[in-house]
Amino acid sequence: MTTIGTPLSPRATKVMLLGSGELGREVLIALQRLGVETIAVDRYENAPGHQVAHHARTIAMSDPDQLRALIEAERPDLVVPEIEAIATPVLEALEAEGVTTVIPTARATRLTMDREGIRRLAAETLGVPTSPYRFCDSLAELQAAIDDEIGYPCVVKPVMSSSGKGQSKINGPDEVAAAWEYAMAGGRVSHTRIIVEGFVDFDYEITLLTVRARGADGEIATQFCEPIGHRQVGGDYVESWQPHPMPATALERAQEIAGAVTGNLGGQGIFGVELFVKGDQVWFSEVSPRPHDTGMVTMVTQWQNEFELHARAILGLPVDTTLRAPGASAVIYGGVDATGVVFDGVDAALQVPHTDIRLFGKPESFVKRRMGVALAFDDDVQTARRNAAEAASRMKPRAV
């Protein structure tokens, strides 16, 4: 039986989120609806999650001393990492000491904090299909890896980055040096290690939201949401839709791969498993042990969206991954470099049929920063995609 206390009381059920961007914000809201006391942590003040949590804290989460001190002071029941740049050895130590429980586990957080840990687990330990890859610590090693094994075209990524930062495709030898420099500039922490991957000739890529939650018998079971299709530009998602049509054989294989990877990582919660698909062939790409940006579409497509699924699963509550309606999401960009922007056109955006918007409340805007998302549902995915894109285009951020 799951028992939840009253927030701001001695018996409160306390959950701390490490990382309080737009995804963390929605998780916090879902937790609060279930009566949980929430603590939002980020590296800068007034982060989106700070604006909705019971408590807002600002620290350098990659600093082990700061992270340990905060967790020991707050004593949350659960610690939920929402970003990769965290001092994971501290989480492992605190979990081992019985101070708190890390979601999904401290080990899973460590393995998925960069591309090397999870790629080696998937390809070398579990033997699931992936693109050919090498890890490199210098430009010379990168060039040698391409010449000796990977070939052209190929994709270079920092071992630790998010939202496509530092990622580029190399089509020939004259692009290698620039790709290396771009990866160095885009990494999440001071790091000189990259992954170079052989280019997979795929038909499309999907996110398969995979939920590990307790069933009626008390045992952890795995459930899958309908596949989410998405379009990326420069490694960063610009629109997503659900469901994405797939052959039955490919879907079954995708679920097998996602189940194997998340089962090894263990724990409870939602995982965003990214996969490449060509016909009936499926390759594993990446996994995040948390809600996924492409999964924001579930706020209009599912009875329980990805944030509610995560909140329920980590609290030991039952989940339902049923699709409610086809739908789509489209990114609303900042459009300007400024702080405290205002958004014109909100009324015009919401005049598009079956649409909704989420503005994230980020204190600083950049031209290509994701500041919100337009959502749409309809009888078919294509109509929903058109409407979401139209609603997003009507949003007009401006500096004041």
Swiss-Prot record:
<keyword id="KW-0067">ATP-binding</keyword>
<comment type="subunit">
    <text>Homodimer.</text>
</comment>
<keyword id="KW-0460">Magnesium</keyword>
<dbReference type="GO" id="GO:0000287">
    <property type="term" value="F:magnesium ion binding"/>
</dbReference>
<keyword id="KW-0436">Ligase</keyword>
<dbReference type="InterPro" id="IPR054350">
    <property type="entry name" value="PurT/PurK_preATP-grasp"/>
</dbReference>
<feature type="binding site">
    <location>
        <position position="205"/>
    </location>
    <ligand>
        <name>ATP</name>
    </ligand>
</feature>
<dbReference type="GO" id="GO:0005524">
    <property type="term" value="F:ATP binding"/>
</dbReference>
<feature type="binding site">
    <location>
        <position position="82"/>
    </location>
    <ligand>
        <name>N(1)-(5-phospho-beta-D-ribosyl)glycinamide</name>
    </ligand>
</feature>
<comment type="pathway">
    <text>Purine metabolism; IMP biosynthesis via de novo pathway; N(2)-formyl-N(1)-(5-phospho-D-ribosyl)glycinamide from N(1)-(5-phospho-D-ribosyl)glycinamide (formate route): step 1/1.</text>
</comment>
<dbReference type="InterPro" id="IPR005862">
    <property type="entry name" value="PurT"/>
</dbReference>
<feature type="binding site">
    <location>
        <position position="157"/>
    </location>
    <ligand>
        <name>ATP</name>
    </ligand>
</feature>
<comment type="function">
    <text>Involved in the de novo purine biosynthesis. Catalyzes the transfer of formate to 5-phospho-ribosyl-glycinamide (GAR), producing 5-phospho-ribosyl-N-formylglycinamide (FGAR). Formate is provided by PurU via hydrolysis of 10-formyl-tetrahydrofolate.</text>
</comment>
<feature type="domain" description="ATP-grasp">
    <location>
        <begin position="120"/>
        <end position="315"/>
    </location>
</feature>
<dbReference type="Pfam" id="PF22660">
    <property type="entry name" value="RS_preATP-grasp-like"/>
</dbReference>
<keyword id="KW-0479">Metal-binding</keyword>
<feature type="binding site">
    <location>
        <begin position="369"/>
        <end position="370"/>
    </location>
    <ligand>
        <name>N(1)-(5-phospho-beta-D-ribosyl)glycinamide</name>
    </ligand>
</feature>
<dbReference type="GO" id="GO:0043815">
    <property type="term" value="F:phosphoribosylglycinamide formyltransferase 2 activity"/>
</dbReference>
<dbReference type="InterPro" id="IPR013815">
    <property type="entry name" value="ATP_grasp_subdomain_1"/>
</dbReference>
<feature type="binding site">
    <location>
        <position position="286"/>
    </location>
    <ligand>
        <name>Mg(2+)</name>
    </ligand>
</feature>
<dbReference type="Pfam" id="PF02222">
    <property type="entry name" value="ATP-grasp"/>
</dbReference>
<keyword id="KW-0658">Purine biosynthesis</keyword>
<dbReference type="GO" id="GO:0004644">
    <property type="term" value="F:phosphoribosylglycinamide formyltransferase activity"/>
</dbReference>
<dbReference type="InterPro" id="IPR048740">
    <property type="entry name" value="PurT_C"/>
</dbReference>
<feature type="binding site">
    <location>
        <position position="362"/>
    </location>
    <ligand>
        <name>N(1)-(5-phospho-beta-D-ribosyl)glycinamide</name>
    </ligand>
</feature>
<dbReference type="InterPro" id="IPR011761">
    <property type="entry name" value="ATP-grasp"/>
</dbReference>
<comment type="similarity">
    <text>Belongs to the PurK/PurT family.</text>
</comment>
<keyword id="KW-0547">Nucleotide-binding</keyword>
<feature type="binding site">
    <location>
        <begin position="162"/>
        <end position="167"/>
    </location>
    <ligand>
        <name>ATP</name>
    </ligand>
</feature>
<dbReference type="InterPro" id="IPR003135">
    <property type="entry name" value="ATP-grasp_carboxylate-amine"/>
</dbReference>
<feature type="binding site">
    <location>
        <position position="274"/>
    </location>
    <ligand>
        <name>Mg(2+)</name>
    </ligand>
</feature>
<dbReference type="InterPro" id="IPR011054">
    <property type="entry name" value="Rudment_hybrid_motif"/>
</dbReference>
<dbReference type="GO" id="GO:0006189">
    <property type="term" value="P:'de novo' IMP biosynthetic process"/>
</dbReference>
<feature type="binding site">
    <location>
        <position position="115"/>
    </location>
    <ligand>
        <name>ATP</name>
    </ligand>
</feature>
<protein>
    <recommendedName>
        <fullName>Formate-dependent phosphoribosylglycinamide formyltransferase</fullName>
        <ecNumber>6.3.1.21</ecNumber>
    </recommendedName>
</protein>
<dbReference type="InterPro" id="IPR016185">
    <property type="entry name" value="PreATP-grasp_dom_sf"/>
</dbReference>
<feature type="binding site">
    <location>
        <position position="293"/>
    </location>
    <ligand>
        <name>N(1)-(5-phospho-beta-D-ribosyl)glycinamide</name>
    </ligand>
</feature>
<feature type="binding site">
    <location>
        <begin position="197"/>
        <end position="200"/>
    </location>
    <ligand>
        <name>ATP</name>
    </ligand>
</feature>
<dbReference type="GO" id="GO:0005829">
    <property type="term" value="C:cytosol"/>
</dbReference>
<dbReference type="Pfam" id="PF21244">
    <property type="entry name" value="PurT_C"/>
</dbReference>
<feature type="binding site">
    <location>
        <begin position="22"/>
        <end position="23"/>
    </location>
    <ligand>
        <name>N(1)-(5-phospho-beta-D-ribosyl)glycinamide</name>
    </ligand>
</feature>
